[in-house]
Structure formats: C-alpha cells, structure tokens
Amino acid sequence: KIMESLTEVKYKIGTTGTLQETKTHKLQLEGMFGPAYFVTTSADLMAEGTLAQLEIKALVLAYCDEERKLVSKMNYQEEMDWIVRNERRNMFINNLVKDLNGNTLVLFQFVEKHGRPLFDLLNKLDRKVFFVFGGTDALDREKVREIVEKEKDSIIVASFGTFSTGINIKRLHNVVFASPSKSRIRNLQSIGRGLRKSEDKDSVTLYDIADDL
C-alpha cells in the first residue's frame, strides 16, 4: 500500500535476503521495483568473511512404536500440539541449551503451549533468561537486545514472529529451532539472526530439532 502511494518518487529500491521462489510474489515485487538483481549469496559472504560461518546440526528425536501409532491417527494440528506439549521433548531442549556455550536463541511457534513452558524450564538455570513474544513491548525487546550484546552466556526464548526478522544481535552463538516449521522463508530469516559477526564471534551453530514419528 505504501509503494502504491509513492507516485511521485523517482527512485524506489527494495532489498531482501529471502526472495520467495513463487512466481506471484516475484511478479508483485518486480511490478513495484523493477527486475530483481541478485547481488550475492550467503555462502559467498561467509567465504569472504563478511558473515559468520554457519554449522547446522540436525537432531532427530526418536519415539517408541506406541507413540508413533498414536500420532499417525492425528491431523496436522493435533500432531503439532502433541509435539510441542511433549514434556520429554521440552526437557531434551532444556538439557541441550544448558550445555551450550555462548548466547543462545531458542525459537518457538506457539506462545502459551510451548514458549512459556520452555521459558519456565530454562529460567531455572543459573543464567540470564529472557522471554520475548508478540505481547512484549518494543522498548523491552530493545532492552533485551542491548543486554545480550554485553552477555556471554544468556538465553533468549523468543517466538519466530518477533525474532525471525528485524532484530540485530551480533553476539548470538547458537540458534535452536524448538518448534517444527514448514516455512522456508521464516527458517532462512531466523538463521539470519545468527549470521552477524562480532569481535569474539566468527561462527554460529543452528540446532534443528526434528521428530521421527
């Protein structure tokens, strides 16, 4: 709507690191800005040292046959609810984060049934733990960012919606995908939170938790 109103603007420049591969989305952007021009890639920026080196660790959680049979009868939403409410799974995430060195970002999708229980678990650790979601005031989010930039071992438990874009924290050493997500764009944007470099950081590790059901 903003772009449609800028009828007298001579130059319009739009930038993104996650151009969707759908034809409709690309045509919409080209209609507003003109042809897309790919300047570089994340891999090239890592190779030249502009971005932190990314290591991805896929952690596949196994379940017993009884649990698999139970989940096989569920629809997608019921399966998601079962996964994020699973106490053993949340305890695994808690133990994983507890053993990580550096500042860690734990990303979740559902606030009440997943984010808050994870925060309650992690908040028992002897570390600074912050909880950020859609209801968190913008000024409070900025305070969290400023605090974490000065910390070495803090934990941010945040929703994908609030921390997948627009947050610039250089001193993030670990990113944990606590919730399953089918959104390629959101996953890429979330990974981008950890690719900033700092004086004492040149790499970031992504822990992608998968469920073998």
Feature roles, as predicted:
Residues K1-K57:
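Post-DEXD/H (motif II) to motif III coupling segment of the RecA-like Helicase ATP-binding lobe
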Residues K1-T15, L19-T24, L122-K128, I147-K150, ...:
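N-terminal helicase ATP-binding lobe
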Residues T22-K26, G49, T136-R145, R184-G192:
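Short, charged, surface-exposed secondary-structure boundary motifs
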Residues A52-E78, L122, D126:
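Short, basic/glycine-rich phosphate-binding loops at helix/coil junctions
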Residues V71-Q109, K113-K124:
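Conserved interdomain hinge at the start of the Helicase C-terminal
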Residues R116-P117, R127-S164:
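Conserved helicase ATPase core of P-loop NTP-dependent helicases/translocases
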Residues A158, I167-P180, Q189, T205-D208:
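A short beta-strand element within the Helicase C-terminal
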Residues R193-L213:
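Conserved segment of the helicase C-terminal RecA-like domain
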